[in-house]
Structure formats: C-alpha cells, structure tokens
Amino acid sequence: MAGVGDRLGPIILGEIGDIRRFRSGKALNAYAGNDAPPYQSGQFESRNRHISKRGNPALRKACFEVMQALKLAKPQDDPVYLFLLKKEQEGTPYNVAKMAAVNKFLRIYYARAMELYR
C-alpha cells in the first residue's frame, strides 16, 4: 500500500499480529485506539467525539506516520490519499482528517489481508 515502506511495514505487521483475530475492520480500528466511542447522558448525545486512545499506541503512531508519508508522496491513485484530500478540502481540521484517513487505511488493510485467508 502507498505510504508503507521498509520501516513502517514491519512495525504495522508486528503490532497488528495475526489479522484473523479481528472480526472486522472496525475491530482493528478499535485495537489501534482510533475509534470514537459514543458519549450519551440522558437525552444528550454528543456529535463531536474524540478518539478513544485505548488501543495500541505504537500502531496508532505508525499509521499516523503513514499518513504523513502519503502527504509527501502524493500518490494520485491511492484511495486513502484521495480521501485525505477530500477531507481537507471540506475544511476538516488537519489531525481529524488524518485520523479519519487512518480509519480508512486500516479498514482497507484488513480487507486486503483477509482476502489471503478466504
């Protein structure tokens, strides 16, 4: 995948481990701590939520580095890069757009890796 090189690839693979232990791409995002748990109190339900950061910090940092590499490489055919550009053009704050792109990156990674086991 674009943005993942000789250094970040082994880090991501090592931190994720066996991909079959996750039931979905959403579970992989939760493992990375890149999920936004719901916040509710009575009738109030928040729309502006922060990522949980309860997951693997090394994986989250490596994925953040992948997003920085994508910004530098600018691969025009990569869906994650195009998603990142779209979010930035919508006016989404820089780090929020990056974490949304990390979410998409991990879901695509999960789908491609699980194809090997089907």
Positions of predicted regions on the chain:
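Phosphate-backbone recognition surface of nucleic-acid-processing proteins
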Residues: 2-90, 94
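Basic, amphipathic alpha-helical segments enriched in Lys/Arg and hydrophobic/aromatic residues
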Residues: 88-118
